[in-house]
């Protein structure tokens, strides 16, 4: 049964032993108290599961009221982030679903402010601004702002929706719509899919998250990013070559400005 005011926070975990305890502590410090944290292990090989178990034990020992708020889903096969998030969606009990990557940062007021904004806008899909961080998650001063409203057509050329900032109301979208396809840039493909069904993303233009971006991370490889977005245009969205090129030009320009 869906719990009306509960936010289900889904964290895919793969070899995140260095970060995941910080992630758990960060969620515990959220101003909004009605949450459950689903940690979905994707067959980690670095001891992430044991770190999670120990961290949960410490947190519940310090505060018995946290008992039952943590769910650890252990994987037996490495399937990727999309499948891990989908497992989390299947097990989520909350009306609201938020995504958080194990190496990213939420500010304590993130859930509270986004949920209030969602209710104010009567929205099914919201996101917020975020700041790029270094390997220690220290802000670099480079902020990605979000428009107040982002439709499917506008989103094709501006990938400003960052997974760690997303909050969804499944009483409006249902769960099936937000399941992620098992492709590269599965998160972007999912946001487009949701928008195409008439649920634009409403942006709270306030920095409530930090995107930890090591210099050699996958996301900072620009050529790989271009190939991924091209694949989405042509294979997922079935756009023509001409229209794909048109969108790619604007996407590349905005992506370059965002990273300068």
Residue ranges with predicted function:
Residues 4-7, 28-39, 47, 68-71:
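Short loop->beta transition adjacent to catalytic acidic/histidine clusters or analogous donor-positioning motifs
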Residues 18-21, 46-55, 105, 109:
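Acidic helix N-cap motif at the loop->helix transition within catalytic regions
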Residues 1-29:
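N-proximal low-complexity "stem/linker" segments adjacent to membrane-targeting elements
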Residues 97:
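Short aromatic/hydrophobic "clamp" motif used to bind/position activated sugar donors
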Residues 26, 33, 41-52, 77, ...:
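A conserved acidic beta->alpha catalytic loop
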